Amino acid sequence: LIAHPFIDRDPGNGIRQIADEFFEAAGIAGSEITLCAELGSLAAIKQLAAAGLGFAIASKRAIHRDVEEGRLVAIPLQPRTYTPLEVIVPRDKFRSRLITAFADYACEEFARMAREEEEA
């Protein structure tokens, strides 16, 4: 990847942080990466990648349709990366049964999705 132009997300973006951590774990310094664009819009990033102007890192779900329709090709990173997700609720306020039930459901659903992803 080092020899190819990289289309990065804007600073502070979660995917950018995951990409930075991936490169760091692989022993690739930021100065070794050929940055060709730094954008806040995922749609713009996908358009640049589809036009052949560089490669980008995006979540599987964010590019699913583009891959399915043949505009982009996805190459899984090795080792795999994961986006940590958390359910957020008010800190010191009363939590209704509905909020608690939703939080429990969301956690179960995220776990199910992670299992499916590992099996794929």
Residue spans for each PLM region:
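A late-sequence structural motif
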Residues: 53, 73-116
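Secondary-structure junction motif
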Residues: 5-27, 96, 113-118
